[in-house]
């Protein structure tokens, strides 16, 4: 699968959130989208999830314009927004069952997948508690689980590691790398360590402009493999 972003620009009133972004995101590896807060990453994610339209440019999934034919991506999309909402009066199981019904996932398959996801994210023992009793990190894990329901072929996750402890971050990283073998996985983050051992390709965005796109080795070719140092160099030169 190929997700193509072609000269995408997004304007909000007098503010340009994105300026002529061109990227190609393929299945087979995690694509990391990095940049500081406010760089335009979440805006691009929302465009790809067809929650907002670009002011100019197009996005295509295997050659199909997703702005003109949004179902081309919606039917295969798993999306975790930066501020994922959950229903506080529901338990984790109830919430995930509700999301699976919205995605038209077979009930028996959904039950198995929900149990597996709760186990992966160490939530099984809390699955009957209301989400209002969960910590922020626990709710984030539920949100990630919701994005993974239905075995999406395009997975877009925006700042997924927020609130996760180190072990949970490792589990998430390993899961994303496994999933990316057969699908598109786009990971947006401002934390370089999130993509350091995860991404096979990455792009750096700052102030709505694309500063770099390529492999991690290309990104760090002038810093002896040090990704944090390379990131700081790009930010300083900017």
Task: Label the predicted regions.
Residues 57-67, 72-73:
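Conserved ABC transporter NBD signature motif
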Residues 89, 130-134:
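Conserved ABC ATPase signature
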Residues 97, 101, 108-126:
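Conserved ABC ATPase "signature" region
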Residues 149-153, 182:
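A short, proline-enriched helix->beta-strand linker immediately N-terminal to the Walker B motif
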Residues 155-159:
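Catalytic Walker B motif of ABC-type/P-loop ATPase nucleotide-binding domains
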Residues 169-181:
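Helical segment within the ABC ATPase nucleotide-binding domain
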């Amino acid at each position: 699968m190929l997700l193509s972003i072609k000269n995408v620009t997004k304007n909000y009133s007098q503010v340009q959130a994105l300026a002529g972004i061109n990227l190609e995101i393929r299945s087979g590896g995690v694509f990391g989208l990095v940049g500081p807060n406010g760089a335009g990453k979440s805006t691009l994610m929302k465009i790809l999830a067809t929650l907002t339209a670009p002011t100019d440019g197009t996005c295509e999934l295997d050659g199909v314009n997703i702005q003109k034919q949004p179902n081309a991506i919606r039917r295969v999309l798993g999306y975790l927004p930066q501020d994922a909402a959950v229903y506080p009066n529901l338990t984790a199981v109830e919430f995930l069952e509700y999301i699976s019904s919205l995605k038209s996932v077979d009930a028996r398959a959904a039950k198995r997948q929900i149990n597996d996801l709760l186990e992966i994210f160490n939530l099984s023992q809390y699955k009957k508690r209301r989400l209002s009793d969960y910590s922020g990190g626990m709710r984030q894990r539920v949100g990630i689980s919701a994005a993974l329901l239905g075995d999406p072929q395009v997975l877009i996750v925006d700042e997924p590691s927020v609130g996760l402890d180190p072990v949970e971050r490792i589990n998430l990283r390993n899961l994303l790398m496994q999933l990316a073998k057969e699908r598109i996985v786009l990971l947006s983050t401002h934390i370089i360590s999130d993509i350091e051992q995860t991404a096979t390709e990455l792009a750096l965005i700052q102030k709505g402009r694309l500063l770099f796109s390529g492999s991690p080795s290309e990104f760090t070719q002038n810093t002896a493999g040090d990704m944090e140092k390379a990131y700081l160099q790009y930010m300083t030169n900017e």
